[in-house]
Amino acid sequence: MGCCQDKDFEMSDEQSKEEESEDGREDETTDTQRGPRECERGLPEGRGELRGLVVPSGAEDIDLNSPDHPNHKSNESLLITVLWRRLSTFGRRGSSRPSKRQPDQIRKQESPIREGNQEEPEKG
């Protein structure tokens, strides 16, 4: 079972050696170049999956690579977009760029001064 062995599935060393010899996988050069899940699904080298990042409750046993889920790529791109926007807004909080709140604060500080100036001419 080489690199394709599931992390949750435990086998002894003897069992795994027997399975490898039965499968005819004595030459593992291609398996060592890929990640542990890539050789299992036949993904091209260098391609990974965004699996396990967000799992809705009750959806643990659903295979997202099956043809029943045609919107998988659009869901991934939506997830990436949402996370990117959150990250970018989070990063702006500590930046030195002026935010939209500063002009409002300046107006509030100036308004009592203007009101005070308007009251003086009325008195005199």
Curated annotation (Swiss-Prot):
Listed Acidic residues bias regions: 11-30
Domain of life, per lineage: Eukaryota
Biased composition (Basic and acidic residues): 1-10, 34-50, 101-124
Region (Disordered): 1-77, 90-124
Expression across tissues: Expressed in Testis.
The name this protein goes by in its record: Testis-expressed protein 54
Organism: Homo sapiens
